[in-house]
Amino acid sequence: MNFAIAIDGPAAAGKGTIGRAMAAHFGFPHMDTGLLYRAVGRRVLSGMPALEAARALTPEDLQADGLRTAEVGQAASQVAALPQVRAALLDFQRAFAQRAGGAILDGRDIGTVICPDAAVKLFVTASDDVRAQRRHAELISKGADLTLEAVLADLQARDARDMQRADAPLKPAEDAMVLDTSRLSIDEAVEKAIALATARMAAREFSPIRPN
């Protein structure tokens, strides 16, 4: 039986951290779909046309260095606004979501476009200031020289682009459960997400095979 968990939300809200923790808890494979667009964006920055980059994407591209830089993040947001790029990556994501036993995907349009029939849909969010502080700390720890104000402006510009694009805009699915992590620790956010998913599993009489 397939059991897909869709996690959506803006940058630095915690969806990736929650997705990885839930994957470890339930023994599900996990895909950070944002890495697909970052990998495409990275190729575009090197001079490759966006659609060609999307079609040429390989699993190895998702392991490339430099995918988490602010420059690549902005490029990812820009290529993600292109309908032809999103279409080129659609089957790749849906095939992952259909894995036997279960799968967890996090991104910006998982519950609305990629997996509209997902058994669990979470929309993870947090205030702009909290998200900027998290991303700033992450980037500084990696040696970046950016001000908090610059990071906040970057996040807000990306939010606007993601929410206003005509194709698959960032928004909660109508049946998504919203999880605001602004005042939660990582452990608290993960605990709440797991509890929500566990309750939905019980309602569907689904029992995951957890790792030893």
UniProtKB/Swiss-Prot annotation:
Claim: Nucleotide-binding is one of the keywords in the record: yes
Compartment(s) where it occurs, according to its Swiss-Prot or TrEMBL record: Cytoplasm
Cytoplasm among keywords: yes
Pfam families in UniProt: Cytidylate_kin
GO process terms (BP): pyrimidine nucleotide metabolic process
Catalytic activity: CMP + ATP = CDP + ADP; dCMP + ATP = dCDP + ADP
Residues reported in the UniProt entry to bind ATP: G9, P10, A11, A12, A13, G14, K15, G16, T17
Top EC class of this enzyme: transferase
Gene3D superfamilies tied to this protein: P-loop containing nucleotide triphosphate hydrolases
GO molecular function, one term: dCMP kinase activity
GO CC terms, sorted: cytoplasm
EC number in record: 2.7.4.25
Keywords, alphabetical: ATP-binding, Cytoplasm, Kinase, Nucleotide-binding, Transferase
Homology family: Belongs to the cytidylate kinase family. Type 1 subfamily.
The protein's name in its UniProt record: Cytidylate kinase
Source organism: Dinoroseobacter shibae (strain DSM 16493 / NCIMB 14021 / DFL 12)
Gene it is expressed from: cmk
